[in-house]
């Protein structure tokens, strides 16, 4: 994977790569770390001031209220300086078919002008609205095709699912899928740059 990694780590113009993610149970974090390893990019974890409950219905009701009211969660820690990057990967678990609200906060607060954004997500159900909403919420970004990876489902009862252990069992399969996806979007990125004269 040296060719794909080096191409994203030092894309045309000498830009850098940033891998941003939010993860509750480790599923999305594991994928993010694999992308970071393959691209040689920097890693940034989105963290919230508020801790989300596992118990249902609160686990679903709180994010739903955040989306409907626009009162998105406050993030903890300093934001990365996105201006120094050319390519930004953004990872999220699927919450109610779409981007998790902590990731929505990050997207709201960042201007991606001149940046290329590629999304990835982990799901236990249906991520049908992820790519549409990522595109709509990534201000001024050039969006590449997203990729989805199956994750664990938390019922809110019993032990919390270990997403990292679940993904570790599938590491070879995930690695092959990531390789194919990175090659595909790299070709898309280079083609777009050539078409736009950049």
Residue ranges, per PLM feature:
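FAD-dinucleotide binding site
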Residues: 57-61
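FMN-binding flavodoxin-like domain, especially the glycine-rich phosphate-binding loop
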Residues: 3-18, 23-48, 62, 67-198
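Glycine-rich phosphate-binding loop and adjoining beta1-alpha1-beta2 segment
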Residues: 48-56
């Amino acid at each position: 994977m040296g060719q794909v990694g080096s191409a994203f780590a030092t894309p045309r113009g000498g830009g850098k790569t940033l891998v941003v993610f939010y993860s509750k149970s480790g599923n999305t974090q594991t994928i993010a770390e694999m992308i970071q390893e393959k691209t040689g990019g920097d890693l940034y974890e989105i963290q919230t001031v508020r801790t989300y409950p596992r118990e249902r219905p609160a686990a679903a009701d709180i994010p739903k209220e955040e989306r409907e009211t626009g009162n998105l969660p406050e993030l903890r820690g300093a934001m990365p300086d996105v201006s120094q990057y050319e390519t930004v990967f953004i990872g999220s678990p699927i919450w109610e078919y779409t981007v998790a609200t902590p990731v929505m906060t990050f997207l709201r607060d960042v201007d991606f002008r001149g940046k290329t954004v590629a999304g990835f997500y982990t799901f236990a159900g249906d991520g049908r609205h992820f790519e549409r909403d990522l595109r709509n919420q990534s201000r001024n970004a050039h969006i590449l095709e997203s990729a989805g990876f199956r994750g664990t489902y938390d019922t809110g009862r019993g032990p919390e699912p270990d997403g990292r252990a679940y993904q570790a069992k599938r590491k070879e399969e995930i690695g092959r899928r990531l390789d194919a996806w990175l090659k595909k979007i790299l070709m898309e990125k280079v083609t777009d740059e050539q078409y736009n004269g950049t």
